Regions:
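Structural motif
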Residues: 59, 67, 101-103, 204
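Cyclic-nucleotide recognition modules
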Residues: 75-133, 137
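Polybasic "coupling" helices that flank or enter modular domains
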Residues: 118-182
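His/acidic/aromatic-lined binding-pocket segments of jelly-roll/cupin-type domains
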Residues: 45-46, 53-64, 79-80, 96
Length: 237
């Protein structure tokens, strides 16, 4: 268990002022200081590995670091990209695949609500509503935008969640996740290559120009996090 309220590191390694503790504190920012201090003592921080599966277990789960690709658990259809600060499980969520190493905070739902009180319940309801609206937006996108825009938005989501320019997915992987026919995903990637947005290698996508990718994407994609600004600038240099 951890105690983000006292990050001095005097009694436990978990109390050190590490970036994951700060990420955890920021993720629950809507709660008052007292509610956060009580509720966050209940949970634990769990490391995850790139390429590993994510399976919801009915507890509260929040991404602290890393990028998680969510799917519907049946056909493998894309349901969203989760990154630091995103609530991914509230007594049942979507399974997925980790696209990078990372960290997840988990805590029992009942105990969290008991400690955080009404604030905690409202926080979880707001998180669930955000997930629902995100999935609705993706459904509208799939119905109203072409393959090029959908693929560009998908890649931009992952890039802005990770700050990286290499995505460990093949064209066929992306086509399956977005429910695109083989001819459609091939044509979309060819168009993005011709525009200078990306380069494809075996089993990977290498992003070359974020601005070009954004110009071709539809309106629903993750805003760039200020925390990634320096990393993105350094990687692009």
């Amino acid at each position: 268990m951890l105690d983000p309220a006292t990050p001095s590191g005097e009694t436990s390694p978990c109390l050190e002022p590490r970036e994951e503790i700060l990420s955890l504190w920021r993720a629950f920012d809507p709660l008052s200081f007292e509610s956060r201090s009580r509720a966050l003592r209940l949970g634990e921080i769990i490391p995850v590995v790139s390429g590993g599966p994510y399976r919801p277990d009915g507890e509260i789960a929040v991404v602290l670091d890393g990028c998680l690709l969510l799917d519907d658990g049946k056909r493998g259809t894309h349901c969203g990209v989760a990154a630091a600060g995103d609530l991914i499980d509230i007594a049942g969520g979507s399974p997925g695949l980790w696209l990078s190493n990372g960290l997840v905070y988990r805590a029992p739902v009942a105990a969290f609500c008991r400690e955080a009180g009404e604030e905690g319940v409202q926080f979880l309801l707001a998180g669930g509503l955000k997930r629902l609206k995100s999935m609705e937006a993706r459904l509208r996108c799939a119905m109203s935008h072409g393959a090029v825009s959908r693929v560009a938005s998908f890649l931009l989501d992952i890039h802005r969640a990770t700050g990286g320019f290499e995505i460990a997915l093949s064209q066929s992987n992306i086509g399956a996740l977005l429910s695109l026919r083989r001819s459609s995903i091939n044509q979309a990637c060819q168009s993005l290559r011709a525009a200078g947005a990306l380069r494809t290698v075996r089993g990977r996508i290498l992003l070359k120009d974020e601005a070009v990718l954004a110009s071709l994407a539809c309106c629903h994609y993750r805003p760039r996090s200020p925390a990634f600004a320096e990393a993105i600038a350094a990687e692009a240099a």
